[in-house]
Amino acid sequence: MFSLQDLCRKHLFILPDVFGEHVLQQLGLYWEKHGSLQRIGNDHILIRRDLILSINEALKIAAEEGNNEVVKLLLLWKGNLHYAIIGALEGDQYDLIYTYENQIEDYHHILPLIQDAKTFEKCHALERFCDVPCLLEHAIKHNMLPILQKYQEELFIRVYLRETLFELACLWQRYDILKWIEQTMHVYDLKIIFNIAISKRDLSMYSLGYVLLFDRGNTEATLLTQHLEKTAAKGLLHFVLETLKYGGNINIVLSQAVKYNHRKLLDYFLRQLPRKNIEKLLLLAVQEKASKKTLNLLLSYLNYSVKRIKKLLRYVIEYESTLVIRILLKKRINLIDAVLEKTVRYFSETKVKTIMDELSINPEKVIKMAIQKMRTDIVIQTSYIWEDDLERLIRLKNMVYTIKYEHGKKMLMKVIHGIYKNLLHDEKEKVMFHLAKFYIAQNAATQFRDICKDCCKLDVARFKPRFKQLILDCLDIITKKTCLNIMEILENHIISLFAMKMMTEDEKNLGLELLYKVISYKMISY
C-alpha cells in the first residue's frame, strides 16, 4: 500500500513556488547537494528548476551516492531498477544493492546496460553460481574486450575455452574480439569464421577471415576451392568476388551457378567469357537440368545459335533433359528430328520413350524412324502406347502403306505378325481373314501360310464357307508381281476345295479359271 505522501510524490508534476526547502524535504522532493526534484512527463526530472535529466540517469547518480530515499522516489516515477544497481556498483554501495536484490531475477539482464568493464565484471559477480567462462561468454556477447584481455593468461591455458569463445565471437559478429583472439593466441581452425560468415551473409566477417588466414601465411588452394563452391552454390556474388581476390578457379563458380540456377552470378561473369566456354556451360546446364531462365540466359549470350549441335543432342538424350530443345523450338530452331534420330540410333527403348513423352513426339513418327534405323525393339515397345491389340494391328498395318523401302516393310510385317500370334483365339478370328488379304497384297508368304494354318483350325461348320470365300477373294488380288510361294499356297488350297466338294458349279468354273490364272503366273515366274 502506498502512503498518502507517496501518492502525492508520484503524481505531483508542478511544484508551487511557495514550497520552501523545508517543505520539499518533508515531502521527500529534495535531493541533498542537488536541490529540489520535479517530475517532467514520464521519463525526465527537473533539478533546482534548471537542470533536466532522464529518470534513469538520475537513478544511477543517486544510487552511486547511496541515497536510497531519492532512489525510492525515482522508482516511484517509473525509473528502471537496473540503472540503480549499475550506479550502486559504480559507487560500491552494496548495502543499497542488497536492499533490492529480491527484485532482481537475473543480474545477467543488467549487463547490456553497462559500458564500463569493471562495473560489468562486478555486476556479473553478483550472480552467485556463475564462473569465469560464463563471464567471458557474456563479455563477448556485450563486446567487452577489456575483460577478455584481463583473463588472457587463463585463455592461453584453456584451449577448448578459447576455441569456444572464438566461435561465439563469430556468432555475435564481434570483429575486434575475433581479431584479438587470433592475433594474440591463435585458434586451431579458422574455418569456423568462414562458415558462420557465409551462413549469416556477413561479408565483413568473411573478409576478416581472409585477413587472419593470410596473416598466417596460409594460401591453401583447396580452401579457396571449398569457399568458391559454397558461396557460388548460395549465389553470394560479393563473397565469390572476395574469394577470387586471393585466387581460385572461376570455372568452379560458373559450374555452381549453373547447377543451382543463380542467374545474377552467371550474368556477371558470362559477359567476360569466350563463346566456347559459354557453350560448355550450356552442356552442363542440360546435364544438370537447369531451369528455363538459366537456359535462356546462356542461349541469349549465344544468340540462340548453337554450333556444337551433335554434342548438345547427345547431352539432351543421355540426361533426358529436353527443355533446351523446347526453348529453341520457340525460336523457330527445330532440333526435334535430330534428337529423335540420334536417340533411336544409339539409345534404348526406355530412353526413346522418355524423349518421346517430354517432347510430345507422335508415336508414328518414332516408329517410322525406328524402322529406318532397323530398331525392331523400339518399334515393338513404342507400339504399346496403343493398349488395345487390335488398334495396334490396325495402326501398324496402315503404316506399311506409307513406308517406301522394302526392308522396312518386311520388318514391320514381322512385328505385325508377332502381335497377331500373341492374340487370344477369339481375337485372332476377328482379324485373320483381313490380315490374309493384307499379306497377299504385301507378298508376305510366310505370314500368309501361318494365317491359313490358323484358319484351318477353326470350327469346320464355320470355317469352310469363310475360308472358301477367302481363297476366292485372294485369287482376285494376285497379280504378276505376286511371289511364287503365295501362288503355290493358293494352288494347294484351291485343289483342297475341289477335293472337299464344297464348291458350286459356278464356283468350280471360277476356281478352274483362277487356277489357270495361278498356273499362268507361275509359268511366267519360271
UniProtKB/Swiss-Prot annotation:
Leader sequence residues: none
InterPro entries cross-referenced by the UniProt entry: MGF_505
Function statement: Plays a role in virus cell tropism, and may be required for efficient virus replication in macrophages.
Family: Belongs to the asfivirus MGF 505 family.
Protein name: Protein MGF 505-2R
Induction per the UniProt record: Expressed in the late phase of the viral replicative cycle.
Originating species: African swine fever virus (isolate Pig/Kenya/KEN-50/1950) (ASFV)
Keyword Cell membrane: no
Keywords from the UniProt entry: Late protein
Pfam (any one): DUF249
